[in-house]
Amino acid sequence: LATNNTATVNIANVNIRSGPGMSYAIEDATSKGTKVHIMKRKNNWLYVRYADHKFGWIASWLVNEHNSQLTKTTKISEATIVLDPGHGGSDSGALSSKGKMEKTYTLRVAKAVAKKLRAAGAHVVLTRDSDEYVGLSARPAIANKLHADAFISFHFDSSPEKNTASGITTYYYHKSTSLALAKALNNNVSTLPIPSKGTDFGDFLVIRDNSRPSVLMELGYINDKSDFKTISSKKYPQEVAHAVYAGLSTYFANQ
C-alpha cells in the first residue's frame, strides 16, 4: 500500500526487473510483506529501493491491496492488457436479424474477460466500459501510451446475407509483433461452441496503428441464427473469458 512514497508487497515472489516492463530481465524477487520505497514511476511500473540499498522495477499493481488474494506472481499478473469492446454509443456495429446491436455484446465480452484477468492480477484497461462512442484512432493510442503487453479488440462478424456464415476469426496486422499472440488465442478458442476459422491478416485500424502485440477477434456472426443464439447467451462471455485467459497464459509463458 503506497504511503508517503513507500509500498508493501502483498504477494509472494514479485519480480524485480531491470526496466519498466515484462521484456526486461528479472534481477531479483521480493517476498510478501517487503517494504519498498518508490523512487519514480513509468508505464505503470515503479522504480523502487528495497532491502536497504537494492534498486529495480516492480509492477505497480502488484503492491495494491486489491491484489492481496494472489498467492504468487505470474506473467499475467505482471502484464498490462488493453481490451477494446468494438463500437459503442452512436456506432452500433453490425446488427442481428432481429436488430440486436453488436456494441452490446462486445462490451459484455470485454467486461467478462477483464474480470477474469484482473482476478489473476493483471493490469487491465478497457477502451470503453459503458455504451459510449470512442474513435478508432483513440483505441490503439491507449495501448501505445501504456506500452501494453497485449491489445485485444472484440467484435462480431456479419455476412451480406443472414445465416450464410459462421465461425470465429482472430486477426493480426503486424506479423512480427502480433502473430504469436493471434496463434495462442486461436489455439484456445477451439474450446468455444462456435467453430474457429483460424488466424488471418486483417487490415483494421485498431491493430494496424498499434505498436503493441495486438489482435482483433471476430467472435461469431451476429446475423447467423445459430451463432447469435450462442453470442447472446449468458454463458458465452464467460466461455470467451476462459479461452482468452488460457491463450494469454500460453502467450506470456513463451515470451
Where are these regions (language model features)?
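Short beta-strand segments
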Residues: 26, 54-56
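SH3/SH3-like beta-barrel fold
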Residues: 33, 46-50, 58
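Surface-exposed patches in mature extracellular/periplasmic domains of secreted proteins
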Residues: 44, 122-130, 154, 194-202, ...
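Active-site-adjacent mobile loop/cap segments within catalytic or ligand-binding domains
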Residues: 150-161, 171-172, 198-255
